[in-house]
């Protein structure tokens, strides 16, 4: 639950930073603001430069740059997943401590301190840093949000088309939003075993939100979501699902 709280805090921080300069105006080298100058514009420039190399295809540019960013962030994602697995391995002992000292508001302040002390000792003995899984998010989220704004605010993208859709308009056939929703569902579902029961509702909420957004926002964003989701599905299979399968086979 604390990890989820940190994620929310990070999103709010990045959103506040973005709000200082991301007013929806087209992004250029002259656009002012730290967020614009150091995050959004560089990615906008990369999108335009890659499109120039691909005969002016901004659709292919979005695909290539999305994959490039995901590859760049891959080591951080792997580190985060290793941390999650380490915390998951400690879950039985952590739950035993919670049971030992009582739950939530029923817990005496002194018992709370004792439990925290034992938890810290458990982390230290196991070589686990409970914050290690959150640290990569401080890098990943700003980059992915900056890329989102770069797509939205690179004015020239809206003037181009790709396959059957205009990048600056919603998909008229609703194919991209639906595919984005399906791939989002598959991606979250593949790691649902890591979620507690209260958080599993996100499996169904996120895809619906993506579909609704995809129906109203430019197709360039839906394309970005689809490509990013497909990359994450492949990554998750090899770094999480396949790992769990091998671990199960070894235990047999």
Curated annotation (Swiss-Prot):
Residues anchoring lipid (N-palmitoyl cysteine):
20
Major location category of this protein: membrane
Which positions are lipidated as S-diacylglycerol cysteine? 20
Q: Which Pfam families match?
A: 60KD_IMP (PF02096)
Subcellular location per the Swiss-Prot or TrEMBL entry: Cell membrane
Q: Which protein is depicted?
A: Membrane protein insertase YidC
Q: How does it sit in the membrane?
A: Multi-pass membrane protein
Q: Give the transmembrane ranges.
A: 34-54, 58-78, 131-151, 162-182, 201-221, 223-243
- Tell me, in a sentence or two, what this protein's role is: Required for the insertion and/or proper folding and/or complex formation of integral membrane proteins into the membrane. Involved in integration of membrane proteins that insert both dependently and independently of the Sec translocase complex, as well as at least some lipoproteins.
Family listed: Belongs to the OXA1/ALB3/YidC family. Type 2 subfamily.
Q: Where is the signal peptide?
A: 1-19
GO biological process assignments: protein insertion into membrane; protein transport
Q: What is the superkingdom listed in this entry's lineage?
A: Bacteria
Q: Name one GO cellular component term.
A: plasma membrane
What species was this sequence derived from? Alkalihalophilus pseudofirmus (strain ATCC BAA-2126 / JCM 17055 / OF4)
Which PROSITE patterns does its entry note? Answer: PROKAR_LIPOPROTEIN
Keyword terms: Cell membrane, Chaperone, Lipoprotein, Membrane, Palmitate, Protein transport, Signal, Transmembrane, Transmembrane helix, Transport
Gene Ontology MF terms in the entry: membrane insertase activity
């Amino acid at each position: 639950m604390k990890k989820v709280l940190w994620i929310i805090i990070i999103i709010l921080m990045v959103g506040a930073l973005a709000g200082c300069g991301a007013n929806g105006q087209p992004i250029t080298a002259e656009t002012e603001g730290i967020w614009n100058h150091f995050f959004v514009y560089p990615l906008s420039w990369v999108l335009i430069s890659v499109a120039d190399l691909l005969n002016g295809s901004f659709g292919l540019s979005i695909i290539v740059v999305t994959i490039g960013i995901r590859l760049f962030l891959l080591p951080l994602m792997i580190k985060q997943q290793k941390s999650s697995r380490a915390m998951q391995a400690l879950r039985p002992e952590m739950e035993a401590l919670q049971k030992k000292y009582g739950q939530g508001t029923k817990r005496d302040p002194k018992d709370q301190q004792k439990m925290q002390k034992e938890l810290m000792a458990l982390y230290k003995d196991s070589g686990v840093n409970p914050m290690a899984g959150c640290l990569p998010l401080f890098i990943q989220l700003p980059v992915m949000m900056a890329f989102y704004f770069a797509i939205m605010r690179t004015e020239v993208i809206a003037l181009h088309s790709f396959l059957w859709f205009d990048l600056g308009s919603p998909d008229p056939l609703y194919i991209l939003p639906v595919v984005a929703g399906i791939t989002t569902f598959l991606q979250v579902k593949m790691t649902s075993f890591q979620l507690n029961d209260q958080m599993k509702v996100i499996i169904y909420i996120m895809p619906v939100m993506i579909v609704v957004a995809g129906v109203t926002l430019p197709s360039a964003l839906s394309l970005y979501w689809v490509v990013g989701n497909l990359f994450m599905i492949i990554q998750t299979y090899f770094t999480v699902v396949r790992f769990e399968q091998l671990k199960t086979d070894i235990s047999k």
